[in-house]
C-alpha cells in the first residue's frame, strides 16, 4: 500500500510507556509516591484517568502471576489478551506432552547417535518471567526417559524477578529433586547478570560461556552452598560469579536445551554457541552442536525450537501500516526489543512505514549508578519525531522506573521516576504543538514497591495496576474536557490498541478483541481551546 504523503501534517497518537511505573495507594516503600512528579500529578488531576490490569489472566498469564515487559508490550501491540508461553509450556509439563515433543525427541536422538552429552541451560527460579523451575523438572524427566546418563545443568540464579537472596531455596529444591530421582548434575552456576545480558556487554556473556565450555572437575561444592558463600561476600543472586561446580563441559557432539521461554535475555548466549561468524568475543566454534531453544529467540538463529511461535494477525502496527500511515518506535537499548519485536508480535523486521530509533543505554554496571539512564536522549529524539508531523503513531518507552527499580536502590529509583516525569513534560509540549493525543501508561508495576512487608528489598515486578491517562491536545479531541470524560474502568493492556484506533478513526479488526477505554465516547472536531499547562 502507498503511504500517505507528509505535505499535510498529521495529528499523532503518542503512546508513552513508563516501564515499571505501577500504582499503589500505600506510600511505604513506594518510590513513585516518594518522587516529586509535578507533571504526572497535574496530568492525573486534570485529564481522563483510570487504572488498568497488567498481570495474571488479564494478559494471558496464570492467575496471580506478575506481568513483565515482554508480556506487556505483546498485549499492547496485539490489542487483545495473548496467551503466554509460560502457560503453554507449563501445561505441556503438567499434561506430560513435553515428553513427546517432536523437536525435543529429535534433538535427543541426534545426541545419542553422536554419543554426546545432554545439557540444560536456563534461569532456575519460579519467577515466571523468563523461565520456571517446573519446566526444568520436566526436562529432567525427559532426559532420564530418553536414556541419558545425566542432564548437565548450567543454572543461572535470579534475584531480579525473585527476592535478591532467594536462590538458595530454588537450588536446594533442584538439589533435592536430583537426590530423589538419582538423575541430574548441576555442572555450572552463574548469576543472570552474566548469562542473560541483553545489552551487548559481551564480557558478561563470555564469562558464562567460558565456564560452560572449559573442561575441569569443578569446585565440588553444591550450588546452594556456593550461593550462600556469594551472599556472605556481598553478592546477591543476580551477580553470582560464574563457576564450574562439576565436570560436564559443553563440547562438540553434545546437545544443549535452553529452557528459558523469553527471548530477549537468551539471545546473546545462544548466539555465542550457534553462530559460525560470531564476533562478540573470540572463542572456538563448537561443531557439531545440537542446540534447541524452548521458544523462538530469533528466526535467524540456526536452532531447533520446541514451541513454535503462535501466529498473531492484525496487530496495531499492522493496521497502521495497512492504512498507509507512518509510525515511529523509540526506546533505549534495554527496552528497544520491546517497542519493536515484542510490540510487533515477535516479528523482527520493521513493518512498511515503520521507523525505529534505538538510544544506547549508559554503560554502567547497574543502573542505580546512573538513574537518568538515556531518558533525556530518548526524549530529544521523540520530540524531534513528533515535530516532523508525519507519524500517525509514535511509541515511546522509558526504561528508568523498571531498570533502576530492579536494583533495589530506593533513592536511585526515586530519581529515576523524577527524571521521567520531567521528560513527560517535554513530550506534552510537543504533543500540544502537533495537535496530537497522548496515551500515558505502563506495562507493569515495579517502582511502586521497593521492599516487602519484612523490610527486605523487593527487586521484582508486582501485580499492581498501572495508570492510564488520556491527554488531549488542540483540534482533535475526545468529547468533554479534562475530568469530564470518564474512561472505562477494569481495562487491561489489550484495550489500549483499540483505543488508539478509535482516536485515529481507523476500524478495529475482528482479531483485535480488546475494548476501547473510551467507552461510549466518540471522536469529534472541537473548537480549539488552550490545553492544560503544567508549569513547563
UniProtKB/Swiss-Prot annotation:
Pfam families: iPGM_N (PF06415), Metalloenzyme (PF01676). GO terms for molecular function: manganese ion binding; phosphoglycerate mutase activity. GO terms for cellular component: cytosol. It comes from the Bacteria. Binds 2 manganese ions per subunit. Substrate binds at residues 130, 160-161, 192, 198, 262-265, 335. It catalyses: (2R)-2-phosphoglycerate = (2R)-3-phosphoglycerate. NCBIfam families: pgm_bpd_ind. PANTHER family: 2,3-BISPHOSPHOGLYCERATE-INDEPENDENT PHOSPHOGLYCERATE MUTASE. Belongs to the BPG-independent phosphoglycerate mutase family. This is 2,3-bisphosphoglycerate-independent phosphoglycerate mutase. It comes from Gloeobacter violaceus (strain ATCC 29082 / PCC 7421). The gene is gpmI.
